[in-house]
């Protein structure tokens, strides 16, 4: 037998052993773990009309916004019914929409709005702001039965900008994650 043939055969054998050992090292038992929580039933969202909630701001004067910088708070209530779950379960609500480019965390007015110079803020009733597009959202404790998820919204004047009077609309998506 040729010496170079024996050497190359030895290299192939050595490479095969290394490959076999490396695949054995990565094939350890129980190296992937799954966990979760199954609820018997989450809550049903109450939809009135075509929206989950419709918020009408009262008429706000430009002068009030220019002086105070923001409007009074208006309630935003999401209604959940038939909630069933273990003691201490919660719902995390995240709010997504077009974020105001000048006021991070605030909802931008729709481009069809004639009013300008403001964004819409959202907060929990304890005053903690819930920023638009923040994946942390806001967490609420649930009880079995019916629950109201309470937020408040307000108009926030943009710093250094004039407020233009007119009508406005804006929309966002509320996502509910039961945890």
Curated annotation (Swiss-Prot):
Pfam families (alphabetical): Fimbrial
Primary location recorded for the protein, binned into one broad class: other
Entry GO CC: pilus
InterPro entries in alphabetical order: Adhesion_dom_fimbrial, Adhesion_dom_fimbrial_sf, Adhesion_dom_sf, Bact_Fimbrial_Adh_Pro
Observed effect of gene inactivation: Deletion of the operon under classical laboratory conditions does not result in any major effect on E.coli capacity to form biofilms compared with the wild-type strain.
Localization in the cell: Fimbrium
Keyword Signal: yes
GO biological process, one term: cell adhesion involved in single-species biofilm formation
Induction record: Expression is negatively regulated by H-NS and subjected to cAMP receptor protein (CRP)-mediated catabolite repression.
Disulfide bonds: 43-83
Transmembrane segments: none
UniProt protein name: Uncharacterized fimbrial-like protein YfcP
